[in-house]
Amino acid sequence: LLAKAAAINDIAVREAAAAATSGRPLSDMVNAYRMSMVRQGGTFLGQRGMMFGAGPDGGFVLDNNYAEAKILAKGDVVVFDCCGKYELYHCDLARTGIVEKSSARLTALYTVVREALEAAEAKLKPGANTEDLKTIAAEILTHGGLDLKLTTLAWHNVGLDVVEYAHPSDRTKGWVVEPGMVMNFELFHRDPDIGGVHLEDSIHVTTRGLEYLSTLPRDVIVTGKGN
């Protein structure tokens, strides 16, 4: 069921991206996501189902009427942080997009964020400590010139809740990974000039390796291109 939830979330993100074109309000993107989730038999979390933002304000990932009213312009960076559920099991995925054209600045930032995330994921296995994995990512971000004070690095499990911890202290002190866990590493950098750069996936940890629940590519989404 977690895999099914992730699959319908992938489709909903693609439909949201296709609606994020210049001259349209962010509300069109949000509505496309919500309608897609419901049409596929899932539900979206909260009032809107996705945390989102565009342009410099996107670093805050706003979720309110003011943000929804923003009219997108070509070159706006868009955050997709999309959460929902299917038959009680949750999905949580984050991607970064840009409206209709690429950006050298976004590409540079995103390259560092993706490298940091994937380096930490490469060491994800039973017996690993999440704080050690977080340190791996933090070192790459720092080496790439990104300010850690503007960056969220957070491991969490996902299942019957979208953010699960076995013990409250796991949130701040980390935990030892066990086989069968489905985990997300949320990496979200906030750039004052262009906005948010966000990437996150759900991963099933097994003794044989990692199983990624999403099949959505990790490249920056150039929106409005039939993604």
Model-derived regions: residue spans:
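Active-site neighborhoods and metal-handling regions in enzymes and metal-associated proteins
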Residues: 1-227
